[in-house]
A protein has these predicted regions:
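Intrinsically disordered, low-complexity terminal regions
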Residues: 1-367
């Protein structure tokens, strides 16, 4: 979707040109792709070759090279201006990949190596991956499924969803919800400012779990035989459990601590404006199923309207520049004083630096 929008913003309609390049790679090789606008799709296969299929306009140019042990793929234009290009790349399954774009959607499927994927305006959707996995988008949702390792996922203005993921997990977004299902981990840290947080997964003995939201509810599953200390805090919400919990301490109405079993794990739940809900795993799974059905119906209703939505790059640039200048310092200061310093740093970093660098570059290209 965003790849199509980027194309509409940056270029006029032009004939598409297709190129195919195949490179044999040694064991342990990696892939690096940079694409300003368009799409990046990466698949895994059993061969020791990298195949790059690209679709671009007549001015676009694809550069594929082997630099040391890294296959480097770049999109460029004969006139030097940013180009819009769609990449479909097939790599050995164990290959590590590093993918970046500005107006680019990123999709990875069937790769079982380390993954780094970053975009400014676009979605990031990954299935698979092992080792260090880092996913980031400013204006786009991020999904990760069937992955394991040390995982860090960030978004600013969209939702994050993790499914069947294991390992050390850190998730942050600013204006979006966080949904984690089928998680197997002894270390989870997830937080958002404007959105709900949902966690359905293991609570491992000796593990550490932290979930926070400023303006949203937190829903967490507690397995029947969990051994965990649950510390909850909310300023303007309720603390609600669907089963009996042994209350060990309370500070006022909105701060309570519960100890379950041997209490060897530690779980901290904090929401400023939302409720904290403790549920059994099956209750959350049923809720998730209902949400998926609801979202599917909404997507079907919205599919026709998406194709008629257009905007121009100049308007977006002007709006984002004003937004970064007017709101980022204000919100950063507000949350630093009122809620959590880590969110203030996240918000200021994401808006002030990323947008400033991106749009400063765009303005410099015009002059």
């Amino acid at each position: 979707m965003l790849a199509t929008l980027a194309a509409a913003m940056l270029v006029t309609v032009a004939p598409q040109r297709q190129t195919d390049t195949t490179i044999a790679v040694p064991a342990g090789a990696s892939l690096s792709v940079n694409n300003f606008g368009g799409g990046i799709t990466v698949h895994g296969w059993s061969e020791n070759r990298v195949k790059v299929h690209a679709e671009t306009g007549r001015r676009g140019r694809v550069e594929v090279s082997l630099v040391g042990n890294t296959v480097v793929v770049k999109a460029s234009s004969r006139e030097g201006a940013p180009s819009v290009m769609d990449f479909d790349i097939t790599v050995p399954q164990s290959m590590g990949v590093s993918l970046s774009g500005t107006y680019a959607d990123i999709t990875v499927d069937g790769v079982q190596g380390p993954i780094n994927a970053e975009t400014v305006n676009g979605e990031v959707n990954v299935r698979g991956g092992k080792g260090i996995i880092t996913l980031h988008s400013i204006q786009g949702s991020v999904t990760l499924a069937d992955a394991s390792g040390r995982i860090e996922v960030n978004s600013v203005n969209e939702d994050i969803a993790l499914t069947n993921v294991s390992g050390e997990i850190k998730v942050e977004t600013t204006n979006g919800g966080i949904m984690m299902t089928g998680i197997q981990s002894s270390s989870v840290d997830a937080g958002t400012i404007n959105g709900d947080v949902l966690y359905e997964g293991t609570v491992t003995d000796g593990g550490s779990y932290s979930f926070a939201s400023h303006n949203g509810d937190i829903s967490v599953s507690i397995p029947d035989r969990a051994n965990v200390t649950v510390a909850t805090a909310t300023a303007n919400g309720e603390i609600d459990a669907s089963f009996t919990l042994p209350l060990t301490s309370t500070t006022g109405k909105h701060r309570k601590t519960f100890k379950i079993g041997s209490a060897s794990a530690r779980m901290e739940l904090e929401s400023f404006q939302g409720d904290i809900k403790l549920r059994r795993p099956q209750e959350l799974r049923d809720r998730i199923d209902r949400k998926h059905k609801h979202d599917q119906n909404e997507n079907e209703n919205d599919s026709d309207s998406d194709s008629s939505w257009h905007f121009d790059l100049g308007s977006v640039t002007a709006y984002a520049t004003r937004y970064a200048a007017a709101y980022a310092p204000k919100y950063a200061a507000q949350y630093a004083a009122q809620y959590a310093p880590r969110y203030a740093r996240q918000y200021a970093r994401a808006y002030s630096r990323t947008y400033a660098d991106t749009y400063k570059w765009q303005r410099s290209r015009k002059h």
